[in-house]
């Protein structure tokens, strides 16, 4: 199976023009060509599971286009998405912001889906996708170190409580790379698919390892790469893996 993780920055693009006429102005402008390029890239990679971070689910920025559904339709995938700020956040009332989400797109048979929420941080959503033989979590962790550490504790409980092998993917915002989550991985029984610690941010000159695909016992990674495509400020991660026979029953 293949999982592709990509923080697509709401398909707003990159480059100097993103910060014109004022810094960050590009967040208010989605680009149809960028969305088309991202979609074609994902389609060419033919993943079984896609984890999208920073996806617009139909605000005025995109002309009411739900980016998760648009990409899923092109792939022939099932989609699941939710606002990343939590049900009680004031951000759910703010135009554009309330449509900022994370999403799973999946071709395998989906056995269940759940939304969990962190107790701290602005970005609180955890999406759980249950497949026949594994569970996949998608996250976008806080920019604040203290909040990230609290969020990792929540993730530890979810991972250890799973009765199936686990994949945990997302933008961890770890400014110190895998050093910051080393103890978490040890405690949760997870390994990083990115054994070479390849950086994923910023896409034009990658220096930081912010994005991760982690996996538990029962899963064997057969290939991992970070394609050098610059449709977003992050680079995507692609991981090929196999679930060992009987791993789900053993985990239970």
Where in this protein do the model-derived segments appear?
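N-terminal, active-site-proximal structural segment of metallo-dependent hydrolase catalytic domains
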Residues: 1-74, 81-89, 244-252
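Beta-strand-turn-beta hairpins that frame and shape the catalytic cleft
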Residues: 1-4, 12, 107-111, 122-138, ...
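Active-site metal-binding loops of divalent metal-dependent hydrolases
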Residues: 7-8, 55, 141, 171-172, ...
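Short, flexible loop segments at the rims of nucleotide/cofactor-binding pockets, characterized by
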Residues: 25-31, 115-117, 142-146
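Structured beta-strand-rich core segments of catalytic domains in phosphoester-bond hydrolases
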Residues: 54-133, 225-228
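Charged helix-capping and loop-helix junction motifs
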Residues: 64-69, 150-156
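Metal-dependent phosphoester-hydrolase catalytic domains
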Residues: 110, 115-117, 130, 147-149, ...
């Amino acid at each position: 199976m293949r999982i592709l993780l990509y923080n697509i920055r709401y398909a707003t693009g990159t480059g100097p023009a993103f910060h014109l006429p004022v810094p960050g102005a590009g967040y208010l402008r989605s680009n149809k060509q960028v969305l088309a390029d991202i979609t074609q890239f994902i389609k060419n990679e033919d993943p079984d599971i896609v984890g999208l971070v920073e996806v617009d689910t139909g605000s005025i920025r995109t002309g009411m286009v739900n980016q998760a559904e648009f990409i899923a339709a092109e792939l022939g995938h099932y989609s699941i998405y939710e606002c990343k700020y939590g049900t009680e956040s004031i951000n759910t009332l703010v135009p554009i912001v309330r449509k900022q989400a994370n999403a799973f797109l999946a071709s395998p048979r989906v056995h269940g889906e759940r939304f969990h929420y962190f107790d701290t941080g602005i970005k609180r959503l955890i999406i759980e996708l249950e497949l026949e033989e594994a569970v996949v979590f998608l996250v976008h962790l806080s920019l604040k170190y203290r909040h990230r550490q609290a969020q990792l504790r929540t993730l530890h409980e979810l991972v250890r409580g799973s009765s199936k092998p686990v994949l945990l993917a997302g933008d961890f915002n770890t400014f110190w790379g895998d050093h910051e989550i080393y103890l978490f991985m040890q405690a949760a029984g997870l390994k990083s698919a990115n054994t070479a610690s390849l950086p994923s941010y910023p896409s034009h000159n990658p220096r930081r390892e912010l994005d991760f695909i982690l996996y538990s016992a029962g899963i064997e990674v057969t290939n991992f790469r970070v394609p050098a495509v610059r449709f977003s400020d992050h680079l995507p991660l692609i991981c090929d893996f196999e679930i060992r026979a009987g791993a789900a029953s053993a985990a239970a």
